[in-house]
Regions:
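Extracytoplasmic and endomembrane cell-envelope/extracellular-matrix remodeling and assembly machinery
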Residues: 1-78, 106, 136, 150, ...
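Generic low-polarity alpha-helical segments
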Residues: 25, 141-144
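Alpha-helical adaptor scaffolds
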Residues: 40, 50, 54-135, 139
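Hydrophilic extracytoplasmic domains
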Residues: 82-88, 92-104, 108, 112, ...
Length: 184
């Protein structure tokens, strides 16, 4: 529990790890400001660590500080521009902040680096849906369900995608493949 972590003697740990553990514990107690203060201490020890910045942004997201989270994720992306996890978090923050076009671009970039993240695929489907591209939302949802082994659900969404996408296009072919595999 958070109270145990905050009360524990931690002199043997590095300063940044102590600060990180306190930040997480404080965030679980709903003390965002104090949690962010602890993260700043950790970042002072390791200022170029993109994952400390990612955690900072994630805590902002969990507390619905979407605009601040976007800014924090931009710093993390600057430190690790090819990291799919950080890109996905940035895309999620953009989506939550209603920056749909930027979210779609960022989430597609993240997907090009890691196509197996079901959380990323869920966010990408939402971005497509909010961009008025329901056929692409259906395709990405079908992919996500197929990756999860939920072939019946994948079939439903692949069929929707096949019906809405231009026949013969790469996206249509992918939807057709998922539909074919999921009907067996």
């Amino acid at each position: 529990p958070p109270s145990t972590i905050l009360a524990r003697e931690q002199r043997k740990l590095p300063k940044d790890l102590i600060a990180i553990s306190k930040a997480i514990a404080l965030s679980r107690q709903g003390k965002l400001s104090k949690a962010l203060d602890q993260l700043r201490i950790a970042q002072g020890v390791r200022p170029k660590d993109p994952y400390y910045q990612d955690l900072y942004a994630e805590l902002l997201m969990r507390n619905q500080k979407f605009s601040a989270a976007v800014t924090a994720y931009e710093k993390a992306v600057a430190m690790a521009p090819k990291d799919s996890l950080i890109l996905a978090g940035h895309g999620r923050a953009l989506l939550a902040n209603n920056q749909i076009s930027a979210a779609l671009k960022t989430l597609e970039n993240a997907r090009s680096r890691d196509f197996r993240s079901t959380k990323l695929l869920r966010d990408l489907a939402v971005a497509y849906a909010r961009s008025d591209k329901p056929e692409m939302a259906a395709l990405v949802t079908a992919e996500r369900f197929a990756l999860q082994g939920r072939l019946k659900d994948a079939n439903i969404h692949a069929k929707r995608a096949v019906l809405g996408l231009p026949t013969g296009s790469p996206a249509w072919q992918k939807a057709q493949d998922i539909f074919s595999v999921s009907t067996k």
